[in-house]
């Protein structure tokens, strides 16, 4: 039986793509990014099946641009105890490994970043077989399958959230997490070196704090500024700024974000940089039930020198 079908031109400027929607043999929505120049190749959609349950909550979702298309990742759960890493928009499809098996996670954390081309990197936590210490797992997603890479050096807390950013001059990723210290701190790890580094001044971070990171890249100086936001033990929104050069980050002093409402203790957090002038943060304030926007104007005072604590 022939499938229903519809097509639109991708509205992203210079994408050169048609977005072709149709049904798979399992009667699920498929999307292929077909080049307008039909002689060019494309990746055929592979249906790994829909997770017959819900998007897990509490958990995390993450959005990234891939091949001129906004892709949203989440953790889904069928009617069993297993949870799977999935694409949840613009289609709903399990991500599979090279053996065509769905990729499991036992935890709630999820983060993603993009090279603004064909590559997405998705990060989550799992227990490597035969161990009791959680590890950060990385999926490099170019199509519908990926072989996980395990970061064996860092020791994230099992209830840690994650943030991830891409550094285009070196084609590196930086992942931020909270560690298993008695006193929680935030740490960062570089995708090339894979060793954990404590972020000085973050000793007030709340256990299981939400994390959000935005960036501004300077192509001429081959550097990047990271604006990292988190919740402290008093449920206040904190900010710490880092300057990336090569494989290193120089962190400045952490600061409570002036004027930001206290955070609901179980809220998550996300943000986006606007015109390189301010960061727009979304979270649920204490006593509220909806995500509210707060604009944090970028100032020179963000770059005070760091201190231990």
Swiss-Prot record:
GO cellular component terms given for this protein: extracellular region; membrane
Membrane topology: Peripheral membrane protein
Residue intervals passing through the bilayer: none
Location within or outside the cell: Secreted, Cell wall; Membrane
A GO BP entry: proteolysis
Listed GO MF terms: serine-type peptidase activity
Keywords noted in UniProt: Cell wall, Glycoprotein, Hydrolase, Membrane, Protease, Secreted, Serine protease, Signal
Protein name, entry field: Wall-associated proteinase
Species in which this protein is naturally found: Coccidioides posadasii (strain C735) (Valley fever fungus)
């Amino acid at each position: 039986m022939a499938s229903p079908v519809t097509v639109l031109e991708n509205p992203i400027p210079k994408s050169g793509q048609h977005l072709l929607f149709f049904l798979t043999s399992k009667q699920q929505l498929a999307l292929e990014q077909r080049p307008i120049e039909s002689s060019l190749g494309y990746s055929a959609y592979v249906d790994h099946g829909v997770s017959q349950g819900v998007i897990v909550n509490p958990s995390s979702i993450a959005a990234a641009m891939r091949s001129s298309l906004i892709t949203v990742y989440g953790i889904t759960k069928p009617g069993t105890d297993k949870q799977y890493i999935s694409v949840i928009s613009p289609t709903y499809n399990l991500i599979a490994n090279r053996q065509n098996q769905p990729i499991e996670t036992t935890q709630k954390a999820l983060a993603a970043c993009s090279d603004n081309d064909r590559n997405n990197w998705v990060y989550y936590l799992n227990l490597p077989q035969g161990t009791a210490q959680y590890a950060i797992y990385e999926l490099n997603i170019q199509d519908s399958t990926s072989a996980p890479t395990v970061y064996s050096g860092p020791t994230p807390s099992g209830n840690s959230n994650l943030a991830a950013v891409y550094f285009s001059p070196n084609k590196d990723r930086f992942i931020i997490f909270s560690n298993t210290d008695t006193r929680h701190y935030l740490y960062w790890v570089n995708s090339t070196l894979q060793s954990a580094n404590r972020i000085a001044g973050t000793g007030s971070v709340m256990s299981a704090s939400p994390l959000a990171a935005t960036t501004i890249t300077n192509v001429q100086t081959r550097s990047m500024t990271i604006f990292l936001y988190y919740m402290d033990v008093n449920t206040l929104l904190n900010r710490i700024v880092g300057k990336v050069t090569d494989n290193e980050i120089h962190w400045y002093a952490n600061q409570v974000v002036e004027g930001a409402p206290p955070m609901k203790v179980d809220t998550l957090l996300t943000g986006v940089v606007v015109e390189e002038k301010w960061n727009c943060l979304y979270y649920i304030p204490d006593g509220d039930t909806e995500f509210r926007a707060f604009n944090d104007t970028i100032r020179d005072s963000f770059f005070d020198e760091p201190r231990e604590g």
